[in-house]
């Protein structure tokens, strides 16, 4: 008897935390990375959720700090022949799909994502086959194989608009892998959405009880929430959006204190945007509960200075992203559909 994969029941082992570096070691690796970037004709692209010192280095070396899609876009347009992707593995894959001629290096290929892990291709493909009348929309936080099985790829920044568009065409949707984001777009659009039941281990930990207590301590604070969070958290929010949208909301909201319900890595760029405001972490533990991620992705934390230097210096199978040519072609189609759709939204 076969047992259907249950993303909600899956427990993913966390990687060990990187060994802390002292100030001299940090300076040594910073200088080494700067030298290696020049020698390899490389540029560094980092996600908002990496540690502040990694984002700072990306800025100092002319790189990019953004969400996964903009990271890949930046890399595709940049003249560098090599991209150093500080993030998790699917981000490196997306960069390779959009820039096949470039060398894509990562500090470690073991930097996973619970959304990616929670959507294995064989089980997901069978799920799609069981609902052949539905259009398959997958979040960017998926493997190249899952993207290749989809009709559309989407980021949180345009998810609502895309589902509205598909709903206007009378299409029924399979959404994967994040159930919270899928439920959010369904409620925003009223579309017929069948959700795969994955979740982000960071956002899934935000707790309403603890958040309510924090709001009592800071009654004048606005709450900014990423839509990968549970519905009960989203319903408390003053602003809901992707990483880039939350940074914009921090600038436009009049509140002097902001409670932020997403990975705390975003605080680096958000504080730059609003230096006069106080940023507060939304709690990830409730009554009698403890947190596993504690508002920081453990795989993002693998992108340390030493690992980045090793990735640039060593390259090879331990650090270079490869995507099968057939998979790349399959994944490029839904990615390009998304890019074209995003362009029409800006027009």
Curated annotation (Swiss-Prot):
[4Fe-4S] cluster binds at residues 113, 200, 297. GO terms for molecular function: 4 iron, 4 sulfur cluster binding; metal ion binding; quinolinate synthetase A activity. Its cofactor is [4Fe-4S] cluster. Its main location: cytoplasm. It catalyses: iminosuccinate + dihydroxyacetone phosphate = quinolinate + phosphate + 2 H2O + H(+). GO terms for biological process: 'de novo' NAD biosynthetic process from L-aspartate. It is an enzyme of class 2 (transferase). Belongs to the quinolinate synthase family. Type 1 subfamily. Gene3D superfamilies: NadA-like. The keyword Transferase applies. Catalyzes the condensation of iminoaspartate with dihydroxyacetone phosphate to form quinolinate. It is found in: Cytoplasm. Iminosuccinate binds at residues 47, 68, 139-141, 156, 226-228, 243. The keyword 4Fe-4S applies. Its EC number is 2.5.1.72. Binds 1 [4Fe-4S] cluster per subunit. This is Quinolinate synthase. Pathway: Cofactor biosynthesis; NAD(+) biosynthesis; quinolinate from iminoaspartate: step 1/1. SUPFAM superfamilies: NadA-like (SSF142754).
């Amino acid at each position: 008897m076969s047992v259907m994969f249950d993303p909600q029941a899956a427990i993913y082992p966390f990687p060990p935390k990187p060994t802390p570096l002292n100030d001299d070691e940090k300076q040594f690796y910073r200088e080494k990375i700067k030298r290696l970037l020049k020698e390899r004709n490389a540029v560094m692209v980092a996600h908002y959720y990496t540690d502040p010192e990694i984002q700072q280095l990306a800025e100092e070396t002319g790189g990019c700090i953004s969400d996964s899609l903009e990271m890949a876009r930046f890399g595709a347009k940049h003249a560098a022949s090599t991209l150093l992707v500080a993030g998790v593995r699917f981000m490196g894959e997306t960069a390779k799909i959009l820039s096949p001629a470039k060398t894509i290096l990562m500090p470690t290929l073991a930097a996973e994502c619970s959304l990616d892990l929670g959507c294995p291709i064989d089980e997901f493909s069978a799920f799609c086959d069981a609902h052949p009348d539905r259009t398959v929309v997958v979040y960017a936080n998926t493997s190249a194989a899952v993207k290749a099985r989809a009709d559309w790829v989407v980021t949180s920044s345009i998810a609502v608009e895309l589902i509205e568009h598909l709903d206007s065409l009378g299409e029924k949707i399979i959404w994967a892998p994040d159930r919270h984001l899928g439920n959010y777009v369904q409620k925003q659009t009223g579309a017929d959405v069948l959700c795969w039941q994955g979740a982000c281990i960071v956002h899934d930990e935000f707790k309403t009880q603890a958040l309510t207590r924090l709001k009592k301590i800071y009654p004048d604070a606005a709450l900014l929430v990423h839509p990968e969070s549970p519905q009960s958290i989203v319903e408390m929010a003053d602003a809901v959006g992707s990483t880039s949208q939350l940074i914009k909301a921090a600038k436009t909201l009049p509140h002097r204190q902001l409670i932020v319900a997403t990975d705390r890595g975003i605080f680096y760029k958000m504080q730059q945007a609003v230096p006069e405001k106080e940023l507060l972490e939304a709690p990830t533990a409730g009554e009698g509960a403890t947190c596993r991620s504690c508002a920081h992705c453990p795989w993002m934390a693998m992108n340390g200075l030493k690992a980045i230097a090793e990735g640039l210096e060593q390259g090879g199978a331990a650090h270079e992203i490869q995507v099968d040519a057939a998979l790349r072609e399959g994944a490029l189609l839904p990615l390009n559909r998304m890019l074209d759709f995003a362009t029409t939204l800006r027009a």
